[in-house]
């Protein structure tokens, strides 16, 4: 099995292990919280909100549909959730542009979902459409004022936008996040000092989820601040963690996509 197929299979397996997941608040169909398990829960008893919910069988159907009908016809046949999952499947396989096409169809066919399409924002970031990505994430924060990750990703888009650049003052203010690793990540992006970096590094010792997210967001911070070498070391290390290789978390796939887009060997 090829590496992209293996990654997608793990995401599918992660989805299959879910049981009775509930969303924290109204979001896109795929933003549900999977049931906790010893292998995926963090020190706070939390699981990542970005768990990829690619239902078994959806990927094969998506692949068939993508070659058998034009986008407008596929949109008429696919429910919003299937379009979203198909876009996520494409992203996992590093087909960023293809994922955007599906996510745009979701917004076109269900405009009410636009503020909740965090997946679209991530794809726009990797397509280097930073202004559009920042706008997507800020729409999310507007309806979810405690959304720490979207605030960080809006900042990351701004930092790479040549018209804006790195400016910590642009970090959107949000409420408290229940996940310790995301609170520490937000503190690093907000303060930008050595103490905050050490605090996020220390979180890594609390569990597999914490370790992965600590490495990922410390790496993303360094890249935003212009330290490409430091970013590479940390994000590549994140892709090699036990959690990244076993969980099927969408953000674990994102870390791999990040490395591929930057030309970093994992």
Task: Identify the role of each PLM range.
Residues 1-44:
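N-terminal chloroplast transit peptides
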Residues 81, 98, 115, 149-151, ...:
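Start-of-helix register in tetratricopeptide repeats
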